[in-house]
Amino acid sequence: GIYVGSTCDPETKKYTYGGIKLKQWGKRAGTILVPNGTYQQCDLANANILMISRTVYNVLGSFSNEYTHGIADFDYSLSAVKAGFPVWVLPFYCGECQNDHGPSWLPQGSTLKQRIKYLYSPKGLAYKQQLHYIRKFFPSEYNEMKIKLWLKTLFPFIWTYLKK
């Protein structure tokens, strides 16, 4: 199987990365699994601290080259679950790491050129990579995701309003 070591913020000690359990297979909505003293089975794993057994590696190989910054860890863990391998969140925090994800969209004050650049940036919204991932694992949400990514880019004030 795969073992996920969760991390917490060094100052606040709050969860930053680890595992997520999907609420329903085929839908992106999930629940963050905070270490609670027991092993918890998950579907999505952040690879900040990750142990992949040789058995899994021999079947799945390495992370996909489709992704340049993020998403590859989620792709890998979902592929493992799909192949019948368990993915476990360890019962305790294994390290400290600040959440270094940038904003999920740029504000209205940004120029359209900046927002479109952010849309396609691997460290921004990673448009092509995000859509590849969604098409592969959550195909029923593909069109919705495409609309959301463009809505965030073209009309960030609407997205800001909707997220309140």
Question: What residue spans do the PLM features occupy?
Answer:
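Non-catalytic, C-terminal membrane-associated alpha-helical segments of glycosyltransferases
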Residues: 108-164
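Short beta-strand-to-loop element that shapes/binds the nucleotide-sugar donor at the catalytic cleft/hinge
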Residues: 3-21
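Short, hinge-like loop/turn segments at secondary-structure boundaries
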Residues: 19-24, 105-108
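Active-site donor/metal-binding and catalytic loop motifs
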Residues: 83-110
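A short, conserved alpha-helix in the catalytic core of glycosyltransferases
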Residues: 45, 50-61, 66-93
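Structured catalytic cores of enzymes that bind and process phosphorylated ligands/cofactors
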Residues: 3-6, 27-30, 50, 57, ...
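Short, Asp-centered acidic motifs that coordinate Mg2+ and/or phosphate
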Residues: 1-2, 87
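A recurrent flexible, glycine/aromatic-enriched loop bordering the glycosyltransferase active site
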Residues: 30-52, 115-118
